[in-house]
C-alpha cells in the first residue's frame, strides 16, 4: 500500500517534470523566434537606416508638426524626404488624388500624363533629381508611387485649378459639374509690415493657410533643408512637395517669403516652368527681393498665381509682388505694410488675368481686405509676433460687423458659413478655411526661426464625423476627411533636434 502510494507520487512528479521541461522548451523556442523576428526587423531597419543617402537626415514631431531635416545633394535631399515622410506622403497623396479627381471630373491618369508630358520637360535637372529621389525614397520604404505621381502631387495647386480650365477651354470640354467647380479659390490671409508700423521697427510677417480641411489637415510638415547649392531654408510644407506651396519660408541670407492667391485667375502657359519649381528655386537662391522677382518671372507658366509678400531682413525692406501671367507689379517700402487676402491691387493684373469682382463687400477677399486694414492701422507701432498670432485667429466679419467665424473672417471657417461664398463658388457649409498659421520677424529670421500653429489659428477643433452627419452632401470626402486638431503656437528653428 505504502509502496503503491510512493509510486503514484513518483509518477506524478515525473509527469510534472516532463511538463516543466516541455514548457521551458516552448518558452525558449518562442523567445528565440521572437528575438529572431525582432532581429530581422531591426536588421532590415538598420539596413535601410545605413543607406548613405540618409546621412544627416532626421525627423521628430512637436506641437502637431512633423519636423524634417534634409541635407546633401538633390538626390540625397529627395531620397531623405521620400523615405522619412513615406507614411505621410502616401496619406497626403490619397487625399489629393480624391480631391483633384472629384473637382475636375478627370481620372488620375489625366494628371499623370500632364506631369509626364507637359511639366517634366520644363523642370531643371536639380529638381528633377530631387523628385526622382523622393520617388526612390518612397519605394525604398514600401510606398509604390511613380515619378509621375510625385510630379503631379507637387503640382496639386496648379494642375486642377489652372491647367484644367485652360485645357477644357482649348479642347472644348466641360466635364465639371459647373463652372464654379473650376474657379480658382482664394488661399490664405497674410501681411508683412516694417518701420514705424511695427513695435521694434523690424519686419513682422504672418500667414495662415486656407484650403479644404481634407487636404489642409495634412499640411503639417516643417522642413529644414541644407542644399548642396544655394541657401539653407526653413519652411512649412506638404508631404512630398519640394516647395512650401502655401507659402511661408526663410532662407539663410535673410529673405522672408509668404503669399496669398489671386482669386478667379485665368491663364496657363504649357511651355512655362511649374510654379512649384520657381518658388522653390527663388527661396533657395534668392539673395534679395529683386532676385526673388526675377526668378519667379523667368518661365512663368501662370500656375498658382499669387500676391507675394516679401521681406529682406538685411535691409528692412518689404515688398508686394503681384504676379499674373500677362501682367505683374512690384511695390516696395522700408516704412509701411502690405496685406493679402486674395484680391488684386494692380489694375492691369485685374484687367488681364482675373474676373474677380473687387466691388462686392459680401465676398471673402474684400471683407478680409477691409479687416486687415482695420487691424494694421489700429495697431500701428505695436505690431509684433504675439499680436500677429492674434490677427491670424481673428473672427470679426467686416461686412456684418459681428464677431464670429465664417468664410469672411481672417481665420476662415467655411463649415460655419450657411451661404458660402458666391465669388469663389464655395458652397454652404463647405469644410474649408484656415488650417494652420505661421509668424516670424527679423530677429527670428536671423536665427532661421518661426512660430507655427496647426489647425485653426483661433484654436477651434473641427470634428469630421458630426460634420458629415449634418452635411451629407460632403460624404464624398468621407474616406479622407478627418478631425483637424489645434495645437499651441510652437517655435521652430533651423538645425534643431527633438530635445532642443
Q: For each predicted feature, which ranges?
A:
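Hydrophobic membrane-insertion alpha-helices, especially the h-region
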Residues: 12-24
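N-terminal mature-domain region immediately after signal-peptide cleavage
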Residues: 23-290, 297-303, 309-332, 340, ...
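Flexible, small-residue-rich N-terminal segments that precede or flank a structured functional core
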Residues: 347, 352-354
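N-terminal Sec-pathway targeting helices
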Residues: 2-15
Amino acid at each position: 500500500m505504502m509502496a503503491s502510494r510512493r509510486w503514484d507520487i513518483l509518477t506524478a512528479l515525473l509527469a510534472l517534470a516532463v511538463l516543466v521541461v516541455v514548457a521551458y522548451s516552448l518558452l525558449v523556442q518562442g523567445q528565440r523566434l521572437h528575438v529572431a523576428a525582432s532581429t530581422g526587423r531591426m536588421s532590415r531597419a538598420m539596413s535601410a537606416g545605413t543607406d548613405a543617402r540618409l546621412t544627416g537626415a532626421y525627423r521628430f514631431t512637436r506641437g502637431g508638426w512633423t519636423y524634417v531635416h534634409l541635407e546633401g545633394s538633390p538626390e540625397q535631399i529627395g531620397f531623405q524626404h521620400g523615405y522619412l515622410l513615406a507614411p505621410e506622403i502616401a496619406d497626403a497623396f490619397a487625399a489629393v488624388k480624391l480631391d483633384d479627381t472629384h473637382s475636375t471630373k478627370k481620372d488620375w491618369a489625366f494628371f499623370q500624363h500632364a506631369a509626364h508630358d507637359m511639366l517634366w520637360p520644363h523642370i531643371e535637372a536639380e529638381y528633377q533629381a530631387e523628385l526622382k529621389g523622393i520617388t526612390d525614397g518612397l519605394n525604398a520604404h514600401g510606398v509604390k508611387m511613380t515619378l509621375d505621381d510625385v510630379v503631379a502631387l507637387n503640382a496639386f495647386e496648379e494642375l486642377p485649378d489652372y491647367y484644367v480650365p485652360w485645357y477644357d477651354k482649348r479642347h472644348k470640354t466641360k466635364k465639371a459639374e459647373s463652372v464654379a467647380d473650376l474657379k480658382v479659390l482664394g488661399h490664405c490671409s497674410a501681411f508683412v509690415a516694417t518701420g514705424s508700423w511695427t513695435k521694434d521697427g523690424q519686419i513682422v510677417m504672418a500667414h495662415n493657410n486656407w484650403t479644404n480641411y481634407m487636404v489642409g489637415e495634412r499640411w503639417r510638415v516643417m522642413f529644414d533643408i541644407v542644399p548642396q547649392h544655394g541657401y539653407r531654408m526653413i519652411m512649412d510644407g506638404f508631404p512630398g512637395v519640394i516647395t512650401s506651396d502655401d507659402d511661408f519660408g526663410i532662407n539663410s541670407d535673410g529673405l522672408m517669403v509668404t503669399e496669398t492667391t489671386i482669386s478667379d485667375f485665368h491663364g496657363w502657359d504649357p511651355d512655362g516652368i511649374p510654379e512649384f519649381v520657381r518658388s522653390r528655386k527663388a527661396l533657395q537662391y534668392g539673395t534679395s527681393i529683386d532676385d526673388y522677382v526675377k526668378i519667379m518671372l523667368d518661365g512663368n507658366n501662370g500656375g498658382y498665381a499669387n500676391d507675394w509678400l516679401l521681406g529682406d531682413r538685411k535691409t528692412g525692406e518689404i515688398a508686394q509682388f503681384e504676379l499674373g501671367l500677362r501682367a505683374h507689379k512690384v511695390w516696395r517700402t522700408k516704412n509701411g505694410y502690405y496685406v493679402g487676402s486674395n484680391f488684386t491691387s494692380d489694375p492691369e493684373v485685374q484687367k488681364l488675368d482675373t474676373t474677380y469682382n473687387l466691388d462686392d463687400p459680401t465676398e471673402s477677399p474684400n471683407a478680409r481686405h477691409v479687416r486687415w486694414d482695420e487691424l494694421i492701422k489700429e495697431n500701428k507701432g505695436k505690431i509684433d509676433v504675439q499680436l500677429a498670432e492674434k490677427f491670424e485667429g481673428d473672427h470679426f466679419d467686416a461686412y456684418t460687423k459681428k464677431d464670429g467665424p465664417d468664410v469672411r473672417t481672417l481665420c476662415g471657417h467655411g463649415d460655419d458659413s450657411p451661404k458660402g461664398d458666391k465669388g469663389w463658388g464655395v458652397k454652404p457649409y463647405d469644410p474649408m478655411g484656415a488650417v494652420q498659421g505661421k509668424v516670424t520677424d527679423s530677429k527670428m529670421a536671423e536665427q532661421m526661426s518661426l512660430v507655427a500653429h496647426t489647425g485653426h489659428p483661433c484654436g477651434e477643433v473641427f470634428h469630421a464625423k458630426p460634420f458629415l452627419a449634418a452635411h451629407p452632401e460632403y460624404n464624398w470626402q468621407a474616406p479622407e476627411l478627418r478631425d483637424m486638431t489645434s495645437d499651441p503656437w510652437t517655435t521652430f528653428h533651423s538645425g534643431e533636434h527633438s530635445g532642443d
